[in-house]
Amino acid sequence: MTLEEKNQYEILNEFIDPNEIEFIFSDKPINRFKTKPELEDKIALLTKLKNDLQNIKNCELKESAKKLVFSDGNSNSKIMIVGEGPGQKEDEVGKPFVGDAGLLLNKMLKAININRQDIYITNVVNYRPPNNRKPEPAEITRYSEYLRKHISIINPKILILMGSTAMESLFG
């Protein structure tokens, strides 16, 4: 084994313990963030997060929106989808992905035999930006704290970020 191969092997072992390879095939949750939702009731944590968003202060998005668009689907799902933000239809209904984008998402999920109610869906921002504009960087930054908590509570095995805004909210 060359020195370079040995270094690659050592780096790989830092991430994967060959004695615990069965973890990859288990249903054990993956802990991505420092909060420990397994110690508290998931429903209580989601309710608190929703209340925090409903009580957010000095937020132009909240002031211009009709409803909080929090989430939809199964909170115990292994799959979580994060979209950009609510549109007009989502603002009226109070659920993510119910407008034209929702119809497309439903078709995509159906094509791969996944029922929408078997996944969990939320957005980067939870209030509709005026005129369906893209959320501004300051809004994305402000709401990313809530999104990270949301992801931590749901703790999915698969996280699907729909678009550049979702990517930006988590990775800058």
Can you say where each PLM-predicted feature lies in the sequence?
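Ser/Thr-centered flexible coil motifs
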Residues: M1-T2, E136
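Short linear clamp-binding motif
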Residues: T2-F25
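A polyanion-binding, active-site-adjacent surface
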Residues: D17-P18, E22-G172
